[in-house]
């Protein structure tokens, strides 16, 4: 069984955190509201992947083609019910056994 280590996932988490921040700022601008409210709106829309893009387009058109795949990747990674969900990745790393303290050879 291959193991996933946090040090290998950290750049991915950082990337997605930056992407979520970007989408929250886009949503704040589109709604002309403050960022904390927009983050709450973003979380409300987490189960409606494509509806988020339609929601952005409702007030004025934006080029959604550039962000569509990134948003789908984000929502799949963080909110999807697949084997790649964050909780299952975390659970799979705890089953790694090795003699070294960090789980590496």
Swiss-Prot record:
Keywords: Mitochondrion. It is found in: Mitochondrion. It comes from the Eukaryota. One of its GO terms (cellular component) is mitochondrion. This is Uncharacterized mitochondrial protein ORF10.
